[in-house]
Amino acid sequence: MIKNKFRIIFLAIFTISISAEYRLGRDYSIVDNPLPVKKDGIVEVTESFWYGCGGCYSFEPAINDWASEQGEDVSFRKMPVPWSKTHQLHAALYYTINALELGPSTHTAVFVTIHKEGNFLQTPKRIKNFLKNFGVEPEITDQYLNSFTIKQKLNRDAKHARQLKISSTPMIVVDGKYIVEVKQGRSYQEMLNIVDHVIELQKPNS
């Protein structure tokens, strides 16, 4: 009985120490103008990224593994930043791949093509040639890249990026208001540990 009490006390102290490990203002920040969340009881996590970002390429395996381990109370999505014309083209490529249901391996192939093969996919022609490798005819790629639906998504993402003041990638947004970003000396695993910490704080029963 006494041993069990000590065990409970130890676990409580351990949990508190873990929770106190990360602090608002030092390890993560809060935005001035948060985005509204869509569903009560669901913690929304968004990765702001760009295919041309070397850090995003390195982060991709870790964030994908992390996302696959989340339960039903966490919603995860990626948001390609549409800053410049090249960013917008890559963002349109991201949504085209999703719309055509080409799967995660195609997103990985984009990163590899850019960062390993040196093809930056900075023109529609190069993107059309790239997607031909996945059985997509150039005219179909054109239709999707220039579709009203995808342009709407780019406009939405541009608005959200401005509102959240996203200035670098990769960057994680939790529940539309908490920002976890890459910092010198911070590993990607540490970044995800901070995200986990913020998620736990945001869950209804926390």
What kind of feature is each model-predicted range?
Residues I2-K85, N155-A158, R162-Q163, H197-S206:
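Extracytoplasmic thiol/disulfide redox context detector
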Residues G52, A67-Q70, I97-E101, I114-G118, ...:
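Sec/Tat-exported extracytoplasmic proteins
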Residues G52-G55, P82-T86, T113-E117, I150, ...:
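Solvent-exposed loop/turn segments at secondary-structure junctions
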Residues Y57-E60, H87-A91, G185-Y188:
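Conserved strand-to-helix beginnings and helix N-cap segments that scaffold or border functional pockets
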Residues E60-A67, H90-Y94, H107, P124, ...:
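Extracytoplasmic/secreted envelope proteins and their assembly/folding machinery
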Residues E69-L100, P104-K132:
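Structural microenvironment flanking redox-active thiols in thiol-disulfide oxidoreductases
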Residues N133-S206:
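C-terminal cap of thioredoxin/glutaredoxin-like
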